[in-house]
Structures are given as C-alpha cells and as structure tokens.
Amino acid sequence: DNVIPSANSMAARFFLELGHACGQTQWIDRAEAMAQAMHERVKTDPFWHSGWVLLFEHLARPVPVLKYGASARAKAMEIWREAPLSPLLVPENSIEPDQMMLCIGTQCLMAEAEKARILEALSE
C-alpha cells in the first residue's frame, strides 16, 4: 500500500467523513475496521502509510459537521468562515428551517438558532 496517498486509505477516509455527514454508523464502522486492519503496519512504518496516519487522526478528532435548516444557510456559511476549525456543512430537512445542529463524531448537540452558541461549541 505504498502509493501516496493510497486508494484504500482515501476510501476509508471517505467512508468516515460520509458516515459522519450522513449519520450512517455502518460507514464509520467500515472505516474503523479498515484502520484496524492496517494498525500494525502503520505503527511499524508510519512514513510509508501517511494516508492511514491521517485517517487515524480523523478517527481521534472527527471533523465537526454543521447541519442546517433551509433558512439557516447564511448563518451556517458565516460560522464556516469564522470558526477556528471549519465544520463540514450539510443541509438537513429534519430540523427547523432556522435551526442548526453541530455534530462531532456520532454526538450531536441540541438544535440551535444562535450563531454565537455554535461558534462557542466549536472553540471548546
């Protein structure tokens, strides 16, 4: 798997990020299983497995996902520009139109309309 970046590590990262964005735990589980299968190789020779090292970093610190209702897109974009760690923005029909919901990993905070509260949660 010496190709930089390896197709397998990119696929695993895709499963992980898509799983977080869509709330599909089976995709997250798939990424974790792929990472586990490579763990010993990465530990032994991390320089030859940089794509996998990045995946392990994303497993340890997932990218925040900000889900937003139909009329909250502008606020979500402001948060994306202002946050210390820019979240992945995902439109979400299951929350109120003016609400936003911050998710990190598989944990989501209560839906919120206030931009300041979301920014505060992102900076913690």
Roles of regions detected by a PLM:
Residues 1-124:
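Glycan-recognition and catalytic cores of secretory/periplasmic carbohydrate-active enzymes
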